[in-house]
Amino acid sequence: MIEHCNKKYDPMNKRLILIAVMALMLGLSCLAQAKIKPRKVDFKHVKEVIENPDNIYYYPKLMRQFQSDDTTMTLEAYRNLYYGYTFQEDYNPFRESVYSNVVEQLYYKQPHSRAECDSIEKYARMSLDDNIFDMNQMKFFIFSLKEKKKYNRAALRQFRLDRLIATIMSSGKGTKEEPWVVITPEHEYNIVNFLGYRATNHEELGDGIEYITVEPKEGKSTKGFYFDVSRMMEVAALKFPDM
């Protein structure tokens, strides 16, 4: 008999389940940032603090804290970690792990056997080793841990994801005047999905600003969200001049 780690399965709702889980994650992250006024990212200041060995936000220290699942990391620490990543040698805004598609295919092949849950965990972890801020792989990794009843580990990884969401949302309001700042295109869609919207169109407005149109929601007037990708494009132009 095959042991299933996901006993309730409706093939028509597999994507809706994921969206519901992500909505819960957003709620947690919004609570985390509720008392924090959004403010613009000062990349010059970020560079100064993360490159100073005597600063509490020295990048190697931040990365060690992050990788050790340190739940004492503040939102300010996460802001310097996330935006400071753009100054690291291995930063590639368009990076995609070779394992990411493997994980996605396994995830949507429901219900899962125990071995398949193990594989989702394994390949999601390998994907995150390649692309540390891949929120989709974080979701899959957390899913596999919960399915295997590793709730403590799942909670630690959930904290990471919640803080990253809060970090992006603390950078603005998603408006033309105060866009959210992201360091990879994927994160634009992650935020849109976390808010419970479905993207319908993507526009490049110039000056490093992008606009994602969303499907209308009943009772909501939101038509879309603005994102600042200027730092991402600045680095891409230097590292990939032929693009």
How would you name each of these model-derived features?
Residues 34-117, 175-243:
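N-terminal alpha-helical interaction modules that lie
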Residues 134-136, 163-177:
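Boundary/linker segments of alpha-helical solenoid repeat arrays
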Residues 151-167:
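TPR/TPR-like (Sel1-like) alpha-helical repeat modules
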Residues 123-124, 157:
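Alpha-helical solenoid repeat scaffolds, predominantly canonical TPR units
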Residues 1-38:
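Bacterial Sec-dependent N-terminal signal peptides
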